[in-house]
């Protein structure tokens, strides 16, 4: 089940990146404490480390990761921001995930 492992790793990576970007947003836009920058930096460090765990060429990982990031950002919109995604948000996420699957799981000769 390497596909499930890859997708799970992408989802965890996206969550770390989103949290690492959301916390400074809270400080800058919502007037929250500057101390949020500490966990934000740690989250972005974890994000970077997680990217190194993907078992394929970095360019392919970055390209495919973008599809999962889009999906996770739409989930964040729904769960954290409390905004229900539109049909177009869901279709766009599905297309992005399809692109990720093609990039990551298509047969290749090495």
From Swiss-Prot:
SUPFAM superfamilies in alphabetical order: Multidrug resistance efflux transporter EmrE
Transmembrane annotation, as ranges: 7-27, 33-53, 63-83, 87-107
Keyword entries, A-Z: Cell inner membrane, Cell membrane, Membrane, Transmembrane, Transmembrane helix
Origin: domain of life: Bacteria
Name this polypeptide is given: UPF0060 membrane protein Mmwyl1_1139
Main location: membrane
Intracellular or extracellular location(s): Cell inner membrane
Keyword Metal-binding found: no
GO cellular component, as recorded: plasma membrane
Mode of membrane association: Multi-pass membrane protein
